[in-house]
Amino acid sequence: MRIILSDFISLDGVVQAPGGKDEDRDGGFQHGGWSMPLFDPEAMGAVVGEVMDRTDALLFGRRTWDVMAAAWPERAGDPYADQMNSIRKYVVSRTLSPEEASSRWNNTALLGGDGDAIEAIRALRRSGGNGGLQVWGSASLARQLVEHDLVDEYCLMLEPILLGGGKTIFPSDRRARPLELVSVKQAKTGVLICTYHPVRRSANA
């Protein structure tokens, strides 16, 4: 599978709590819901739909999955919600049980219960075909995937706002990771919707 990392991201690299005031207050974060005034349904909604159309499964960290699992099942009947509820989902957690995961949100499977989530994701990426495995939010998990060079595509909605600190998806390991810009679109709200692919270096480079 191809791992697609999708995130709303501020100009200073913050991805924390874009959707709601109380979504994630870790570290005293006070700007929850910061991306909502900048959301352009026409441009950004179209990109979200396009990426979902080539996504075979979703991958979440525990916190983001908790937020999603509490919201989407209640929206059944809406075409997009029905797609979200029926698609295969994976959640990385050491504390959830497989039974709890599947009962709280339909078609959810547990990864990393044995403590090695990255290896489980690496195996899934190797064996899951050519479809997309899309990661939403999940800053800590996303950062680990970037760190281990497991991301095949970045779909970043770069928003014209500075948040002054918060969770990021970028490692601080001082490694350079070149990216190729595949496409960029501008929303009416000033958001730049950027798609990047990693530039894979050969072993002899």
Q: Regions from the language model: what does each represent?
A:
Residues 153:
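Periplasmic plug
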Residues 1-150, 160-205:
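Portal/gating segments that form or line small-molecule/metal binding sites
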